[in-house]
Regions:
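Cell-envelope and extracellular/periplasmic
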Residues: 1-216
């Protein structure tokens, strides 16, 4: 049976224990390699959905930020892959968001861009690096489109130095600038099970949850 690519929306049950979170990327890579071997297509496209947002009151979602980060890392681990970010459409009390149309449209962007070579931005902002200089952290992004912006024109939310306490951040051209007293080890974004992080690109596609090292 010929197929053009693979779409995957899975992971809720894997995101409940840290051991399963940590092994998810490697297991996903093995799964994709197996599919590619069976179809004799070493670059068979693989596009997947990053978990949305969930509250921890009615669901065991404490590790969802770490799991979303492991999914982001899969973009480097698995060739010819793409990730649909959906942290902005989750429900606090429902592990399965009902807005599947938006999920499908975001997956379709990856297929249109990478498989069918359409001139379309496939993703929301993905971090490419963070640097510290003279009391400021500067974060660069891919897939910013015509520029970064705040969803709904509100105050920019979602950044922290420890994954817990939110800190102010501002958009400067296609970068995020954060004033700090000293260089931190990491910078976090959207590091909550149910996140209100609101950075998007010019296509109104949301930025991924991330934890990246701050270089100097």
């Amino acid at each position: 049976m010929p197929i053009r690519g693979l779409l995957c929306y899975q992971g809720e049950s894997n995101a409940q224990e840290i051991e399963r979170v940590n092994e998810y990327g490697a297991l996903s890579s093995l799964m994709v390699n197996d599919y590619r071997a069976k179809w004799k297509a070493t670059q068979l496209p693989f596009f997947f959905v990053q978990l949305s947002s969930i509250d921890t009151l009615k669901y065991k979602g404490r590790l969802w930020p770490q799991f979303r980060e492991e999914q982001r890392k899969m973009l480097q681990l698995i060739s010819n892959s793409g990730m649909a970010v959906c942290s902005d459409i989750g429900f606090k009390n429902d592990v399965h968001p009902t807005n599947k149309k938006t999920v499908g449209e975001r997956l379709a962007r990856w297929a249109l861009n990478k498989t069918y070579r359409k001139n379309i931005i496939p993703s929301g902002p993905l971090p490419s690096g963070a640097k510290y200089l003279n009391g400021k952290i500067s974060i660069d992004f891919g897939y910013s489109g015509k520029g970064l912006k705040v969803s709904g024109g509100k105050i920019l939310k979602g950044f922290s130095l420890d994954g817990q306490k939110e800190i102010p951040a501002q958009i400067l051209q296609n970068k995020i600038i954060i004033a700090v007293m000293e260089k931190p080890v990491f910078i976090y974004y959207g590091w909550e099970p149910f996140t209100e992080a609101n950075l998007v690109n010019s296509e109104n596609l949301p930025a991924s949850t991330f934890k990246i090292k701050v270089e100097q």
